[in-house]
Regions:
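Hydrophobic, Leu/Ile/Phe/Ala-enriched alpha-helical segments that form helix-helix packing faces
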Residues: 59-69, 101, 105, 138, ...
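Cap/lid and interdomain-hinge subdomains that line or gate substrate/regulatory clefts
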Residues: 69-70, 75-79, 85, 122, ...
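N-terminal amphipathic/basic leader segments beginning at the initiator methionine
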Residues: 1-67
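Low-complexity, highly charged intrinsically disordered N-terminal segments
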Residues: 53-105
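Active-site histidine-anchored catalytic micro-motif
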Residues: 5, 9-12, 18, 89-98, ...
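Glycine-rich phosphate/diphosphate-binding loops that line cofactor/substrate pockets in enzymes
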Residues: 1, 69-73, 103-114, 302-315
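Hard-cation-handling environments
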Residues: 2, 214-420
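Gly-rich Lys/Arg/Thr-decorated short loops/hinges at beta-loop-alpha junctions or inter-strand turns
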Residues: 77-86, 117-119, 280-289
């Protein structure tokens, strides 16, 4: 029987937000709860598979409930913690979890492999490569023999000397937005199991760092040139002698040396693996200046002026600077303050929906007042305290979304959201 341990820490941390992520922000899974996270263990369909094109899904497209590659495999749960994007993780929290993972692996006895389920953009004060540090600590415990297969977000970072060196099989999502998150995890698990079962030993790896730093707003795989770039991945991965290839955009919202794009591949034919990785990396570099924002850009004052003057409705403005989907504080009030300077909005001539500002105290007060109730609040500006700070509002509660928020949280913790 093949024994494979499961562990990992999964969060996207912006180093430009003052918010610190704590243990309370994470769903912590151990034992049976951890095993039930993965559909190939529970013999369930892959979440979101109907949203993934056949070319991207590959062998996972028509996966049976009982995966043949998962036969006679013992999955050993260690620890997995995942959170919504946020700020850097408290150092003591990370070091506690690192110790728990290492202790768990030491007590687990012999394992043939490790399934390393990570994001790749976790930040911790005092560390410039958290995932690299974690895999190095794991290798110190288990040694060089167990085969490590890593599943990552394409907005993660691959450090050559630590993460790339410490893992044997690395793959990442092929879609942004990440509808294929669970397809990618399943591909990583299948590849690890099949490789261990084959008896061929560890594959040949190749990596090319691409000196590009791009935000997610420029790299949707639904648009060019990212569509063509990621379209190359399954084609190269299908070559004889190549097992898999991944393209990492990297993470723009952390000030760390490892933050850059990369292409990684592995297989048994060294020339084809290296040639395939090089081909994709060269195309990536060639089209680097073609990655553009999907809409016109402007300052917030100018953007609101344009929205008010426009005849197009609805008019959507996206503040990509305070982006909670990439770890922003989500309580910066600059845009709200600018909106409230326009009499067309404050006077009711135009309606505006502002989504969202993080302020749990305001939510509690609104919940207490109830639908239809009035509250006086100082909204936002409590986490990121830079000007203009909290905005004083007299507000009426028009709906209660507490149940919806609880459902979203539960869905995230159960692994039902594609980007979890």
């Amino acid at each position: 029987m093949i024994r494979i341990a499961i562990c990992g820490l999964h969060i996207e941390s912006s180093t430009f937000t003052p918010y610190m992520s704590t243990a309370a922000d994470f769903a912590q899974r151990r034992g049976q709860t951890l095993l039930e996270r993965y559909p190939w263990i529970t013999e369930s369909p892959i979440p979101g598979i109907d949203q993934v094109p056949r070319a991207i899904a590959g062998e996972e497209w028509d996966v049976p409930t009982k995966r043949p590659w998962n036969h006679d495999v013992e999955w050993v749960p260690i620890l997995h913690c995942s959170a919504l994007p946020g700020g850097p993780v408290e150092r003591l929290t990370y070091e506690k979890w690192r110790a728990e993972i290492c202790d768990g692996l030491a007590k687990a006895g012999h394992v043939d492999g490790i399934f390393f389920d990570i994001h790749g953009a976790m930040s911790v004060p005092g560390y410039d490569d958290v995932e690299g540090d974690l895999i190095s600590a794991i290798r110190d415990v288990v040694g060089p023999e167990p085969m490590v297969g890593a599943s990552m977000d394409l907005h993660g970072n691959v450090s050559e000397k630590k993460l790339f060196a410490g893992c044997d099989l690395l793959t990442c999502y092929r879609m942004a937005p990440h509808e294929d998150a669970w397809v990618s995890r399943e591909r990583a698990a299948r590849t690890l199991c099949e490789r261990l079962r084959s008896g061929k030993g560890k594959p040949i790896k190749a990596m090319v760092t691409v000196p590009i730093l791009l935000p997610g707003e420029k790299t949707s795989t639904r648009l060019e040139p990212a569509a063509s770039l990621y379209g190359m991945v399954p084609e190269v991965a299908a070559h004889d002698g190549v097992i898999d290839v991944g393209v990492w955009i990297g993470f723009a919202w952390a000030d760390q040396p490892r933050c850059t794009a990369a292409v990684v591949g592995f297989g048994d034919d060294e020339n084809r693996v290296r040639d395939g990785v090089s081909e994709i990396a060269q195309f990536f570099w060639k089209v680097r200046r073609e990655f553009v924002f999907v809409a016109p850009t402007d300052g917030i004052e100018e953007a609101v002026d344009r929205a008010v003057a426009s005849s197009r409705r609805p008019f959507v403005i996206s503040d990509s600077g305070d982006n909670p989907g990439a770890g922003g504080a989500d309580d910066v009030t600059i845009a709200l303050s600018v909106l409230l300077t326009h009499p067309e909005i404050t006077g009711g001539e135009l309606s505006a929906i502002y989504a969202s500002i993080y302020d749990p105290q305001v939510v509690k007060r609104a919940d207490k007042a109830g639908v239809g109730g009035m509250v006086e609040v100082d909204l936002g500006g409590h986490v990121d305290t830079r000007k203009p700070g909290p905005v004083h509002l007299s507000a009426r509660c028009v709906a209660s979304l507490t149940i919806l928020a609880a459902c979203v949280r539960q869905c995230w913790e159960s692994g039902g959201l594609a980007s979890s």
